């Protein structure tokens, strides 16, 4: 007997929306149908814990996918709990779920169709690819019933004989003509791997297997005849003589159908980390990341209590070439809810600086109506994110225990650690412990800030550092001369990110950072050193004043330096302005903010080394005649040279002319000799005069 029912208004509206609106991402229907089958298996499994008889003859729970090209149907079966007649009527038609209206509102707000399963109405996604759906189900407490609808506003319920049922539940999709691609084994395998690989039960796909079989001509003829007549092949006795004759054989192709398990990679995160081998982690990592190399670090953990989720995080061996591109969409951490795949680009699950970490998060608590639109406001997700960051930091600390392993890690992902210091204020202290730098004392091995502090001299009051292009350049920088003389270690910061890091951090373990290229650097001095410094300032006062007048607005001031010991002079920037290295970086940016650059590129201060012979001689000449023309030339030359040695860019093109004049003076050349040399050079390069009788054509030849 067949009964007809009308869909509840909201469900009818939802089905109409699904059928009449074009969605490009129709493939999600299979995910939702398999997910429902998995839920049915979960329910029967829970019941069997108290009543094992509910499983009947079932030895294991599974989900089967059967494509039928001849009838253009795709069937999904499971041996889960099944549905009664009342369940079919209520759950699939007459009682609207809370998610129905919520999902339609989300669609109107711009949500993606792929979120349908998370609103508890995933069953209806079947109508994305099918024009008719049939559900045959058998619950232990009821008979077999068939639910069927073509989404025309009504559905029917019909009783059926139990002999029709192989498994307790079967949903058959009668595919639309333009959706027959979902009958291809290759396409189905792809979708199962993408969306349902970590379902807790075997997903078996019916596939065709072609094998070659060797048969005799007589066997083939008998088989054909039996097929035509519908009779069983005759069995005849064969005498020894007949059997001894050699029969002709040939190979024929035989097509068989069999079930093939598709989700062979079981969800490792549900297992105890102690029971998972390194090889299993590596295989799992390669499956989710498409990487070919084993991960050097793994963190497998679970969080229980008010919030429950499991996760596995991996550090890849190499950084992707486009890792830090701002517009790159990252899909490194896959989000599952109760082992059902939700999304692979959940940007709010992990901060940008951890964009290189790959892994899986499976939550038991995220609501079914989670969507991209409300992920940011979801409190559960924020707690998950906080725990992921915490566990990743623990993983990095574990890697750091082995210096060689951490060296490789830092080469690949040191920039991310520095980006984290810039962005993540809550974890800045822990991230700073992961930093590594070369220094004047470390040689070819990088040092930690913690180790630096333990090596600090008793009279040292700051952590000294210098920024620049390379370690080699910084080792010979004039800025570190006095620090080296006093035995103070200086950190070399050679990456662009270091500049941004030092803008955010001011101290480490109560020791302030001091940039040796900026103003405000003071070393602890004895009373004798202080007295001597005051004398030098007084002695050089007139020289400093004269040099400031000559240089004008090129410098803010000229003072006696505390940081030089062998170089004549340097240029330093203000304490809160850009360093020379930062200024060069900003100049090279195509989209730089000119107004900001003008503000941050503060006036430079020229510092003199009063003990240097050049400065002593210059001071003597100024005191003898402050209007000496040679003094002005020397001051400009010293300034330009200081620009170069301090890491700035030359802006005055006359620098080369001044150098040439200095070379002439060194060679004791006067103006007349120079003019004669120039005239001789011009004469040598001039074309020879055309002799009489030589034609222009001959010259051309």
Curated annotation (Swiss-Prot):
Record localization: Cytoplasm
One protein family per Pfam: HATPase_c_3
Listed Basic and acidic residues bias regions: 222-245
SUPFAM superfamilies in the cross-refs: ATPase domain of HSP90 chaperone/DNA topoisomerase II/histidine kinase (SSF55874), HSP90 C-terminal domain (SSF110942), Ribosomal protein S5 domain 2-like (SSF54211)
Region described as Disordered: spans on this chain: 211-248
Role summary: Molecular chaperone that promotes the maturation, structural maintenance and proper regulation of specific target proteins involved for instance in cell cycle control and signal transduction. Undergoes a functional cycle that is linked to its ATPase activity. This cycle probably induces conformational changes in the client proteins, thereby causing their activation. Interacts dynamically with various co-chaperones that modulate its substrate recognition, ATPase cycle and chaperone function.
Protein name: Heat shock protein 83
Stored NCBIfam families: PRK05218.1 (NF003555)
Keywords: ATP-binding, Chaperone, Cytoplasm, Nucleotide-binding, Stress response
Molecular functions per Gene Ontology: ATP binding; ATP hydrolysis activity; ATP-dependent protein folding chaperone; unfolded protein binding
């Amino acid at each position: 007997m067949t009964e007809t029912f009308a869909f509840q208004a909201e469900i009818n509206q939802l089905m109409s929306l699904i059928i009449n609106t074009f969605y490009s991402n129709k493939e999600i229907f299979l995910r939702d149908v398999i997910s429902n089958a998995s839920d049915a298996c979960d329910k029967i499994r829970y019941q069997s814990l108290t009543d094992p008889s509910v499983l009947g003859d079932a030895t294991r729970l599974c989900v089967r996918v059967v494509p039928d090209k001849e009838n253009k149907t795709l069937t999904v079966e499971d041996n889960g709990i099944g549905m009664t007649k009342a369940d079919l009527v209520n759950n699939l038609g007459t009682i609207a779920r809370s998610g129905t209206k919520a999902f339609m509102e989300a669609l109107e707000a711009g949500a993606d169709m792929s979120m349908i399963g998370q609103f508890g109405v995933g069953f209806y996604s079947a109508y994305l690819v099918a024009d008719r759906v049939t559900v045959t189900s058998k619950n232990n407490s009821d008979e077999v019933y068939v639910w069927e609808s073509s989404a025309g506003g009504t559905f029917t319920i019909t009783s059926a004989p139990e002999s029709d049922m192989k498994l307790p539940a079967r949903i058959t999709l009668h595919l639309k003509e333009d959706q027959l691609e979902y009958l291809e084994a290759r396409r189905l395998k792809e979708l199962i791997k993408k969306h349902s690989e970590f379902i807790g039960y075997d997903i078996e796909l019916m596939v065709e297997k072609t094998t070659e079989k060797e048969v005799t001509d007589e066997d083939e003829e008998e088989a054909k005849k039996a097929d035509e007549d519908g009779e069983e092949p005759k069995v005849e006795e064969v005498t020894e003589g007949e059997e001894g004759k050699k029969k002709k054989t040939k190979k024929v192709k035989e097509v068989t159908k069999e079930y093939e398990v598709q989700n062979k990679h079981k969800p490792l995160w549900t297992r105890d980390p102690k029971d998972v081998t390194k090889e299993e982690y590596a295989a799992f990592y390669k499956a989710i990341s498409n990487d070919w190399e084993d991960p050097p670090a793994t963190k497998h953990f679970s969080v229980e209590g008010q919030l429950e989720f499991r996760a596995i995080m991996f550090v890849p061996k190499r950084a992707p070439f486009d890792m830090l591109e701002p517009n790159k969409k990252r899909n490194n951490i896959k989000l599952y809810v109760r082992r059902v795949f939700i999304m692979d680009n959940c940007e709010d699950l992990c901060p940008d600086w951890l964009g290189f970490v790959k892994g899986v998060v499976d939550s038991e608590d995220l609501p079914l109506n989670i969507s991209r639109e409300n992920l940011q406001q979801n409190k559960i997700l924020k707690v998950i994110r906080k725990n992921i960051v915490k566990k990743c930091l623990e993983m990095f600390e574990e890697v750091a225990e082995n210096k060689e392993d951490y060296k490789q890690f830092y080469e690949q992902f040191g920039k991310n650690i520095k980006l984290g210091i810039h962005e993540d204020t809550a974890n800045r202290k822990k991230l700073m412990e992961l930093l590594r730098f070369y220094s004047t004392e470390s040689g070819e091995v990088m040092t930690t800030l913690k180790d630096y502090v333990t090596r600090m001299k008793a009279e040292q009051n700051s952590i000294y550092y210098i920024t620049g292009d390379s370690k080699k350049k910084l080792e010979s920088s004039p800025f570190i001369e006095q620090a080296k003389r006093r035995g103070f270690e200086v950190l070399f910061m050679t990456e662009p990110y270091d500049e941004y890091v030092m803008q955010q951090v001011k101290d480490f373990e109560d020791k302030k950072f001091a940039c040796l290229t900026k103003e405000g650097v003071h070393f602890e001095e004895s009373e004798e050193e202080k007295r001597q410094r005051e004398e030098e300032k007084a002695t050089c006062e007139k020289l400093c004043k004269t040099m400031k007048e000559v240089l004008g607005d090129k410098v803010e001031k000229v003072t006696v330096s505390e940081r030089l010991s062998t170089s004549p002079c340097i240029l330093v920037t203000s304490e809160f302005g850009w360093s020379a290295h930062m200024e060069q970086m900003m100049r090279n940016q195509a989209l730089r903010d000119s107004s900001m650059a003008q503000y941050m590129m503060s006036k430079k201060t020229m510092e003199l080394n009063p003990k240097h012979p050049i400065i002593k001689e210059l001071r003597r000449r100024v005191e003898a005649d402050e209007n000496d023309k040679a003094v002005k030339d020397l001051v400009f030359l010293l300034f330009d040279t200081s620009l170069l040695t301090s890491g700035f860019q030359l802006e005055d093109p006359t620098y080369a002319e001044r150098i040439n004049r200095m070379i002439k003076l060194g060679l004791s050349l006067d103006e007349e000799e120079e003019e004669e040399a120039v005239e001789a050079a011009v004469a040598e390069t001039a074309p020879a005069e055309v002799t009489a009788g030589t034609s222009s054509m001959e010259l051309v030849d």
